A protein has these predicted regions:
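Beta-rich interaction/scaffold domains
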Residues: 1-123, 372, 390-397, 441-443
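Beta-propeller fold detector
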Residues: 105-117, 145, 149-162, 190-211, ...
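Beta-strand-rich domains and repeat architectures in extracellular enzymes and scaffolds
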Residues: 113-141
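Repeated scaffold domains used in trafficking and secretory/extracellular systems
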Residues: 117-128, 158-174, 178-180, 187, ...
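Entry beta-strands of beta-propeller and related beta-repeat scaffolds
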Residues: 131-135, 172-177, 226-233, 284-291, ...
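Structural motif
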Residues: 140-147, 182-193, 229-251, 273-274, ...
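Loop/turn-rich, solvent-exposed surfaces of beta-rich toroidal or solenoidal domains
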Residues: 325-393, 404
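Blade-level signature of beta-propeller repeat domains, shared across WD40, Kelch, NHL, RCC1
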Residues: 393-443
Length: 443
């Protein structure tokens, strides 16, 4: 004989009037007696979900029915009780709760100011989030701190030395700055002590000891430079080498003048501006992220010299971002983790005959690294490329200078991620700093 249909309710779907999308319950039936069935329906600040006007559709087993019947627009301000009578006449009781759910991420530009408005020169070469400020290292000048929410000037910190280039923060929040090796200055790295309000030298590779020209054109750190294991990375243009030093409890393990060297042959030739490099973890077998430019000042139309962003393992297993996802030059990037997810924020710029172009910020979900191969026309691209901002003002940038930095701030519903970008132009009207906020909602 046939099996009687005694499970009753099998699925629930909610629809917003006038919207073709349908939103299924977080789990399908059969359901336990008195089990609450949850349906998450998108909401935004701009178009908040109206719980009083929703369409409910249910699927029940054959010879089962809902009493009273559902249909038309219904009110889900409170959990909605539903009763299903099965083929044997048994009643099954459940409630349906609609949960307004923000999108996983949303984005807002908080402010935009050129160097003139920030009272700085055009060479705003280093960006770092330090405490609640945006710290800007002006090249060969002091560090200025700005309110990260408004862009208003707060105070100034004297530079650690001359020819200071980049600003970073380590994993413990210390402000780290570096000197570029120009005119024989040497590559020097400092952290700023809050206690003494002094810059403390961590690394000094002198020109006389063989430091390459322009080392410090880019720099990054991983770990806490004052305790435990940490790493400092220094890069320079016109080669294919990445230099790095290991520290333990604030002291160099790697001698100043004898850094570890990674030769990045996959670049296929010398990069023209020092690459951005980021170590993923403190583990010995950590992967790295790298972005480099081979653009040399000609019109940016030679595909062989277009910038590249890649992830590589110690064995040089490489996964690269599809180059259709960015403009000809990459000015800066940061890879950051939110709980179990990994995101890439990328600052790129076009390149015309005059080494100029507009710049923009984009954000990608690279939790699954294979998605990095997706292009704008591929299926699933909208789940990979989460945001692309508007163009900056045009900037002439012969050195391909720019930067990007992020700060992650926990909230009751998830996290706010501040993302600051800069493109450095030929004068103070072209150099532009922008502040964005990415809001990540726990689903």
């Amino acid at each position: 004989g046939r099996t009687a249909q005694v499970n009753g309710l099998m699925s629930v779907t909610i629809q917003i009037p006038g919207n073709p999308s349908k939103f299924a319950a977080t789990k399908t039936g059969p359901y336990e007696e008195n089990e609450e069935i949850i349906v998450k329906v998108p909401t935004t600040d701009e178009t908040p979900l109206d719980l009083t006007r929703l369409i409910c559709m249910v699927n029940v087993e054959h010879n089962c029915y809902v009493t009273p019947a559902v249909g038309g627009e219904m009110d889900f301000t409170n959990p909605y009780p539903i009763t299903v009578v099965d083929a044997l006449g048994n009643k099954h009781h459940n409630t349906i709760r609609v949960v307004p759910t923000p999108p996983k991420t949303k984005y807002a530009k908080l402010w935009e100011k050129n160097a003139a408005l920030l009272n700085m020169s055009s060479n705003t070469t280093g960006l770092a989030f330090y405490q609640n400020y945006l710290a800007i290292q002006e090249y060969n000048a002091p560090i200025k701190l700005y309110d990260r929410n408004s862009g208003e000037f707060v105070k100034e910190i004297p530079a650690a030395s001359t020819f200071m280039m980049r600003a970073r923060t380590d994993d413990a929040g210390h402000l780290i700055t570096n000197r570029e090796n120009v005119y024989g200055a040497g590559f020097m790295v400092y952290y700023y002590s809050e206690e003494t309000q002094e810059h403390i030298n961590l690394l000094n590779w002198t020109a006389d000891a063989g430091c390459p020209d322009d080392l410090g054109y880019n720099m990054s750190v991983k770990g806490d430079v004052t305790k435990g294991v940490a790493y400092i990375y220094g890069m320079c243009p016109h080669n294919m080498e990445i230099y790095y030093w290991k520290l333990e409890d604030g002291q160099l393990v790697t001698p100043d003048a004898k850094p570890n060297v990674l030769r990045y042959g996959p670049a296929g030739g010398d990069w023209t501006s020092a690459p951005m490099i980021q170590r993923a973890t403190l583990e010995d077998d950590s992967k790295h992220y790298i972005a480099y430019n081979r653009y040399s000042g000609a019109t940016g139309d030679d595909a062989a010299y277009k910038a590249k962003f890649s992830m590589f393992t110690p064995a040089y297993e490489i996964t690269s971002l599809n180059q259709d996802n960015h403009e000809y030059r990459i000015l800066g990037f940061n890879v950051f983790n939110i709980e179990n997810e990994t995101y890439l924020a990328l600052n790129d710029q076009q390149a015309d005959t005059w080494s100029g172009g507009v710049s923009t910020l984009s954000v990608y979900d690279i939790t699954d690294p294979s998605k990095m191969e997706l292009g704008p026309d591929d299926a699933g691209y909208d789940k990979f490329c989460l945001f692309r901002g508007e163009w900056s003002p045009y900037a002439t940038s012969y050195n391909s200078w720019g930067d990007l930095t992020t700060a992650i701030v926990p909230t009751d519903t998830g996290y706010d991620i501040y993302i600051a970008t800069c493109v450095i132009g030929g004068d103070t009207s072209q150099t532009t700093i922008r502040m964005y906020k990415m809001t990540w909602y726990r689903q």
